[in-house]
Amino acid sequence: MVSPWLCAVWGEGASVTACLLSQILAGRGRTGLAALTSRYDGTPEPLLRALERLNCRSLVVALPETACALDRRADTAVLLSCGMGEAAEWLMRGCDRMVVNLDDPDGVPERDGPVPVWTISERRDEADLTARNLRLLPYRTEFEAVSGTDICRLSVPLPEGLGLYPGLAAAAAALSFGVTLEESARRLHRAEPVPVGMIPLPRCSPFAAAGYFDADGGAGV
């Protein structure tokens, strides 16, 4: 059996970013989400295995900023803020590619890391995915995502600019999975920043949100 594609997200806004990314990827098939809080004890491996048994094609895990390593290598690691956290250091060593926020002071050096790096930024033209024509709305954040010659308007369900970096990071991680900006835009327009519609794992830890999203309609049923 082919192992699911795995994306690990770390840093400020990790849970929201992971939730948005899960709903984007659900357009390609059942996608599992495990969002851990700082009070979660242990690794997310039991949750990921449970989601694998439910035939998830892809898995997204949001790691707390406290130490919490994975027991497997991530296909893509999203570092919203790098710093010196143990989880961030593990991800830099234990992934096949990274998405790094160039607007974070600690993110700039990591673009020259040992694995391919996709960079995001609000204004830096050298980033792989940038934002322009930002609109701050009461209930959404809208901007044009620019990747090379591709331009697509994203509408993220977070108010007053709070959706900028989660939206950019989710779209960049989706690109590494083969999802186009246009497809991400369609999914984000129907997405929620919290796991509304997610079908939860039974007997899950009270310190984690874990379950899966199905392809029909964006999130679960």
Regions found by a protein language model. Give the residues of each.
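Walker A (P-loop) phosphate-binding motif
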Residues: 1-46
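Acidic, Mg2+-coordinating active-site environments of NTP-dependent enzymes
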Residues: 2-12, 41-42, 50-56, 62-212
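Short, conserved glycine- and acidic-residue-centered signature motifs
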Residues: 18, 163, 217
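Active-site glycine- and acidic-residue-rich loops that bind
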Residues: 213-220
